Amino acid sequence: MNMNTTYTDQIYEPGTLPPLGCIPRRMHAWTIRQDRLGDPLTAFRDEIVELPALKPHEVLVANVSVGINYNGIWAARGAPKNVLDANGTYGDDRQSFHICGSEASGIVYATGEAVSNVRVGDPVILSASKYDPDCPWIRSGGLPEYSPTYHMWGYEGNWGAFAQFSKVSDYQCVLKPSELDWDEAAVCCATGTTVNRMLCHWDGNRIRKGDVVLIWGGAGGLGTSAIQQTRAYGGIPIAVVSGTERGAYCKSMGAAGYIDRTRFTHWGSIAGLDEAGMRRWSMQAARFRNEIYEIAGGRINPAIVLEHPGGDTLATSLFVCAPGGMVVLCGATTGYLATVDLRHLWIY
């Protein structure tokens, strides 16, 4: 911890913070435990827990605004991975509880003795990426995401954003630009950077001016960021949503138009469909594609499809994607097992 730091037994109510230099010994946290895994509405509970001790390169941040991601649902359900089983395997002491939350903005309240990039009082954005900076792969210039040490803070790693204070590594802290408010800043590093990587990382399929980009879940966190970033790059964002109210919201964020997926019935696995069933599926998928054409103003297939529903939608994404285009995935919220008709890659 830091010089001139005092500690208090007072527990501060959510929404209030102690003065800088004063650190409570305990805090409110929204936790999950092994015996509550299942329905996220009952798996998460408000508990009073002790604040964690800091190691030399760690930072204690008071959270001002936090984002919600689907990995919190996975953690609460205990599937596809039981994060409580892995609690304590990423350099932290094992705890009987787990604090989720993978994006936040806040204020630095304490630093380990080796921290030099931030200091007490700094407003910061927290990145969810956790890894060992001394990993040979990373030290040789490899992307941290491909390191065997890589994991997600607030999902695999404990002490996430769903608490009054979070413990993070120093490299996770980015100074908050004054142009961003706390809420905008909170969603920059998990949602915002994920979208940017999907649009800009892959050689040969980086977004270009005039590209149609199909965005599943357009009214969600990833979707709203994708709409705005696609517009900023000169692309044409088309959102897929579940209802006209969400569609109107997407248009207010800059979408060229939206497709209401509740008007279609071909979602789910195509495995086992007979010839007649496949014909019906193809007719629905073609009708879905025609709505893209109507919004785009011509027979323009998406150059990029931002996929995260997975099991129910991947076959449609491949069906509508432009030749030479890219379907890029960052999740599987409707199911991990997906089926595709490979003929759509080279025949149709």
Predicted segments with their positions:
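N-terminal Rossmann NAD(P)H-binding glycine-rich loop of SDR-like oxidoreductase domains
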Residues: 219, 227
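NAD(P)H cofactor-binding loop motif with strongest signal on the N-terminal glycine-rich segment
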Residues: 217-218, 309
